[in-house]
């Protein structure tokens, strides 16, 4: 779990992951990069993260991936991230590409639905909670 202030340096993060795993006899490193879109008058997105719950969520994913001899990685921004820059990079490393391709999709979708990260639009330098694009965390009472 890598948390950064502001935009992510995608090339640096993915190169670090590649260098870490290239000699581990893995056949696949699949990545997903989320880029902030320019829409609805936003100049940026802003993120708050509750790291203790996020770590538990990631630990559960690591256990799941381990059962398939795979490993999940991710980096996310906190604070403001301007349009056309990245706030999220996820990766799956596996000896088998089919496992990595399946897990990256499941990981990204579960992240969107369950990770304790709150998103705000930044419009005219004002931070506005993006409730319509956010998901309630089941049983947490958040976003009720």
Whereabouts are the PLM-identified features?
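N-terminal, polar/charged subdomain of small-to-medium soluble alpha/beta proteins
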Residues: 1-86, 93-95, 99-105, 109-144
